[in-house]
Amino acid sequence: VIDGKGCRSGAVVERKKLSQWFFDISKFADNLQEELNNLDEWPNKVKIMQQNWIGKSFGCEIEFKIIGDPKIKKIKCYTTRPDTLFGFSFLAVSIDHLLSELYKNDKDFKKFKDECSKFGTTEESIANAEKIGFKTKLLAKNPLDEEKTVPVYFANFVLMDYGFGAVFGCPAHDQRDFDFAKKYKLEIKTVVKPINENDDFKVTNEAYPGPGIIINSDFLNGLEAPNKSIIETIKILEKKNIGKKTINYRLKDWGVSR
């Protein structure tokens, strides 16, 4: 897709709802993952490709309290890094999220949605596209510090069919979030430092997604990240009854209609 058009045909690329047939293969995600171990004659690189395609990940479901409209009280999201919540500076949702019903008559949102429909829908095309957002009037509370609120955006890089169609942004430790925060002048708070750095370490020119030690995070400070810090954060969220450990898959049902 180049400038909203197919690179070969020149046709305008649009996103539309269609009636389609699917094979319900997502039900067999665990079986597919386990059976890879029995494929002794398959090349290892092919099995790795299959593992990535299935995309099994361990993470956490988190509920974020929403203020600004009585019709929306909570938004749920899935994350593999709940331990970076103290670096949370925005909540982003898909243009197909239920929240979009509140903005269906908003002219500016319609323009934004039309603009998003011109982008490709593959992970590769979304990763390469400019990160754009539409700011709502809503605010999300940080579940670990409810005095802290952040803006809620619709964003072109959030897919409705992954997790719950919503992600929390931690710009200091995710490059996509970093680019988005720079564009919209959002806070970039460092909450993980490399092991050999001091506590005053700050992310400046690019995100730091690597391992290290939790900082600037109140009761999580000093924990080894990501392994110990993730486990401890999930325990805290489960105790508060606002989050729980869960498993997610990239694998989706197989569409067979064209």
Functional labels for PLM-detected ranges:
Residues 57-61, 89, 135-137:
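Short glycine-rich loop/turn motifs
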Residues 97-195, 200-201, 206-208:
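Catalytic alpha/beta core of large soluble enzyme barrels
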Residues 1-75, 166-258:
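Residue patterns forming the tRNA-binding/recognition surfaces of aminoacyl-tRNA synthetases
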Residues 74-97:
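Conserved phosphate/anionic-ligand binding catalytic regions in large, soluble enzymes, centered on
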Residues 19-20, 79-84, 154-159, 220-221:
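A short, sequence-level motif marking secondary-structure junctions
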Residues 24, 84-89, 160-164:
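Short, surface-exposed linear segments at secondary-structure transitions and domain or protein termini
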Residues 2, 71-80, 149-154:
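Short amphipathic beta-strand/extended segments with alternating polar/hydrophobic composition
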